[in-house]
Amino acid sequence: YSKTSPKEKQKRGERALKMAYCYERSLQTQKAIASYKNAIRYEVAIPQNRLSYARLLLKNGEYKNAISEFQLVLDSLPGNKLALAGLESARNAPDIKQLGSRYTVKKMDVFNSRRSEYSPVLFGDQFDQLYFSSTRNEAEGDELSGITGTKPADIFVSQKDDKGKWSKPEQVQGGLNTAFDEGACTFSPDGREMYLTQCQSDASFPRYATIVKSARSDASWGKASEMKITNDTLTAYAHPAISPDGEWLYFVSDMTGGKGALDIWRVRFTTAGMGGVENLGSPINTEGDEMFPTFRPNGDFYFSSNGHPGMGGLDIFIAKVGADRKYHLEHP
């Protein structure tokens, strides 16, 4: 872009648009915003590009600018659900922000390293074990990711003692972790099985995220085996969650038939194996992305979404089953 003459407006605008897409995908929000501005200035941005720009403005807390952009998008794409949700979000966000939160968030240094830690889940009868994913140096494998520059993630665990102090996290032993990415684990209600996401790589053909299962023997987790949810090998299956009754596997996928790019689906465990997959549909899934499904023991269903009205980007939502046995969405 910087080496393209300003006189070549079309080419400069097209390159700005490609930069915006790359920055957006790599979560570099401010750089993506700047690149979208350039693409708009050179008049190469279509309404869908301006929708992406508006959603980034919302994510960045630029609510007034976001409102203007969402309104422009709706002039071209009347009724667009993501634009309508974004406009509602941008109008309500300042008041929600001013109200504050009843939760206090603080960093837990005992779990963190200089690398990435994510997807924590409590385990055990007393919830005194914390499993999470980390790309710290102790992870398996020698190769670094071409995307993150770090090692692939592994599952680590920390134990809380009688005094409430958490131990230094250790890599889960027993063959669970591999040289590939392991992350976002969950457990069966009886604690005997772990379900997690594994992302293998192969230079000869594309590989997609899969859900794998590990069985526990005493205190050790064994080598994981792949869960065959469908016969489609060109679809990603990730972020597993087991329903409190142990009958359903909830997961995230980009498979065809969804409402957005990423939806939450579920499949039932039967005596004959896995049943047919079901899309959760409304009010859970939107034209945006829904990810990271999680259950409380009482059945409350938590997930992340960037398609429902919120504060911008991925927000946390809760859904509860009503008397009609359907999910009802509550405020984030």
Regions found by a protein language model. Give the residues of each.
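Short, conserved micro-motifs composed of acidic
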Residues: 25, 52, 59, 63-64, ...
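Amphipathic alpha-helical repeat scaffolds of TPR domains
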Residues: 11-18
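Canonical positions in the second alpha-helix
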Residues: 1-5, 38-39, 72-73
